Amino acid sequence: SRGLGDVYKRQPKNRWEMADMVRFAVDFPYPVALRYPRGEAYEGLKEFRTPILYGKSEVISRESGIAILFIGHMSGLGESVWKAIKEAGYHCSLINARFAKPLDTELIRDLCRDHELIVTIEENVLAGGFGEQVVQYVMQTGEKTRVRTIGISDDYVEHGNVEVLRKEVGLDQETIVAQIKKDYLMIKED
């Protein structure tokens, strides 16, 4: 979520970006919150290690049609969903949002120009989260791009195996890919 007042929230995509974000935070003049999961850090996307710029996302792949924006350790899931969507024949961009706050409004405005659907993936409660912030921004700009937020509803989640729990709340590749295809088909029918 983004509700920490004047604290700037960042979430690294993998262990290399975690080290880069810690270095960035040391020199940053304002309070910074760095969210990372317990357990192992994602080992993928190592070749994508662009410099961290304040409030700016990292564009991993840029096309048109569908844009997937993941934040933090949802990088592995975001990458697998992106690959599955591409293999199904869709044009799709993949974006590492990096910052939950501040939102990279310049990039989102740019994505709205050539994407009909923006999908946000976060392992946070949707209410007050990153995806909700994207929805609000797109609505304020008057853009016609649709936004699908994928995350956790504001319900109690039992303690347990992380992969099982993610599947239960819809944070798995199969569920997300099916939702994206359904949403995109509805857009094309309009």
PLM regions and their residue ranges:
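Flexible, glycine/proline-enriched loop segments at strand-loop-helix junctions
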Residues: 9-12, 166
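Conserved glycine-bearing catalytic or ligand-binding loops at nucleotide- and phosphate-handling centers
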Residues: 11-26
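Short, small-residue-biased leader/transition segments that mark boundaries at the very start
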Residues: 1-8
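Thiamine diphosphate
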Residues: 27-190
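Active-site core segments that coordinate phosphate-bearing ligands/cofactors
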Residues: 9, 23, 46-48
